[in-house]
């Protein structure tokens, strides 16, 4: 029997320091994707690269925006008042999630600092939850569909949006002893670890919560072992680590300041500004030239770089530029953008989405079984084949031609 514990945003050195049970297992750092959590989850559950599963960011340019209705209300898209935008975001999210039209983990986020005139140009990359049978079904098979197709008795704990601190702890108790005896696999989703890291960084609040999670994993392992007549194994992992941000005023980059230096405004161009990625789409060559000129200024200051073909090849980011971004600037750690689609960033102490090679960005992989000696670092691509191997679904590994490797001895 396999117990998989996913913890969002737990970094390797904090696991070693504050999670003694997990640290006592076989452990390796895990290398993240060059993107945010939505890209990581898609890679974890499909065993495919970003340019294969095609989820890089939550938002992409497209025709199926949940905000299309804004354009139908006369003059509404020109009313860029923050309280109004927050209200429109809240109402739209409620309508789409309550109706079941969108069940994705993200829901329908508010595009806080993006002018309303652009909202209708963007759609969600994922519209349903990762364990929905239709998720990525047109492209490949996901972990959850493989479980269903092979009649693996399983339970999924706390995999839903608006994750709260104790959800996994509480929801795990609904599995009775009788049900535990039937099961081959349990997937536990612990998403609040990422919230704690964003809010508190490496401070004591995060450390205390990690210890609580560690105790929960240990107690669940012991509870299942007492009941199940099968050999019980653990795989515990995160999608990425966290990097402590420089929260001084100089480190919070308002990209529009650089456009102003050139006599421009960032919102003259179709854009999505996130924590450390700025994406642009162009209506003509002049716009492209003007944006590129500004982004080169940021490059010359050593703040980051425009993502070029070499970077796309290295990190498997050869996606459709018309949807994901025709020009993308990456802002390097420990800085972040302010005035983004997510808000203003002033209260965020720790972040992710940075180059996967940053040591503080390494996530965790912990296992009761020994990991192959030659494996120094784990890739998110390895999660699916290792899980299927543990469930004795090796034929599926061969058929799917997964990109990762099996990690166990």
Give residue ranges: language-model regions.
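A structural signal for well-ordered alpha-helical segments within the folded catalytic domains
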Residues: 1, 16, 39, 138-145, ...
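Metal-dependent active-site segment of extracytoplasmic phospho-/sulfohydrolases and closely related
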Residues: 3-7, 12, 21, 212-254, ...
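His/Asp/Glu-rich, glycine-adjacent segments
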Residues: 48-203, 212, 272, 290, ...
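Short catalytic/ligand-binding loop motif for oxyanion handling, primarily in non-cytosolic enzymes
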Residues: 12-15, 52-54, 163-166, 195-198, ...
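Acidic/histidine-rich catalytic neighborhood
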Residues: 242-283
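Active-site neighborhoods of enzymes that stabilize oxyanions during catalysis
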Residues: 270-390, 404
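Residue-level preference for the first positions of well-ordered beta-strands
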Residues: 1-3, 183-187, 231-233, 326
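Short, structured active-site-proximal loop/turn typified by the sulfatase FGly-forming signature C/S-X-P-X-R
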Residues: 13-61
């Amino acid at each position: 029997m396999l117990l998989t514990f996913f913890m969002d945003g737990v970094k390797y050195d904090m696991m070693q320091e504050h999670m003694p049970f997990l640290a006592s297992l076989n452990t390796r750092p895990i290398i993240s994707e060059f993107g945010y959590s939505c890209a990581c989850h898609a890679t974890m559950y499909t065993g495919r690269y970003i340019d294969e599963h095609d989820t890089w960011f939550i938002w992409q340019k497209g025709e199926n925006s949940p905000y299309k209705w804004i354009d139908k209300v006369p003059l509404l898209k020109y009313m860029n008042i923050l309280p109004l935008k927050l209200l429109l975001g809240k109402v739209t999210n409620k309508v789409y999630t309550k109706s079941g039209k969108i069940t994705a983990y993200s829901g329908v986020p508010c595009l806080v600092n993006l002018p309303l005139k652009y909202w209708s140009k963007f759609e969600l990359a994922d519209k349903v939850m990762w364990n929905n049978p239709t998720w990525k079904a047109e492209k490949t098979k996901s972990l959850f569909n493989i479980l269903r197709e092979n009649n693996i008795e399983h339970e999924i704990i706390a995999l839903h949006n608006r994750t709260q601190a104790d959800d996994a702890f509480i929801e795990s108790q609904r599995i009775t002893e009788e049900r535990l005896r039937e099961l081959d696999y349990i997937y536990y989703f612990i998403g609040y670890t990422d919230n704690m890291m964003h809010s508190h960084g490496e401070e004591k609040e995060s450390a205390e919560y990690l210890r609580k999670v560690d105790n929960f994993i240990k107690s669940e392992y012991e509870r299942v072992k007492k009941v199940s007549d099968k050999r019980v194994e653990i795989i515990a992992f995160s999608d990425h680590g966290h990097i402590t941000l420089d929260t001084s005023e100089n480190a919070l980059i308002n990209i529009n300041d650089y456009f102003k230096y050139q006599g421009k405004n960032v919102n003259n161009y179709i854009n999505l500004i996130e924590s450390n990625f700025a994406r642009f789409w162009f209506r003509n060559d002049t716009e492209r030239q003007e944006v590129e000129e500004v982004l080169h200024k940021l490059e010359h200051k050593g703040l980051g770089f425009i993502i070029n073909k070499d970077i796309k090849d290295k990190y498997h980011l050869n996606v459709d530029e018309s949807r994901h971004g025709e020009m993308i600037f990456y802002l390097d750690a420990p800085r972040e953008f302010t005035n983004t689609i997510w808000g203003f960033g002033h209260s965020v102490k720790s972040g992710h989405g940075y180059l996967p090679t940053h040591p503080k960005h390494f996530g965790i992989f912990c296992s009761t079984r020994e990991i192959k000696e030659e494996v120094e670092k784990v890739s998110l691509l390895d999660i699916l084949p290792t899980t299927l191997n543990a469930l004795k679904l090796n034929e599926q590994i061969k058929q799917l031609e997964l990109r990762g490797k099996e990690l166990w001895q």
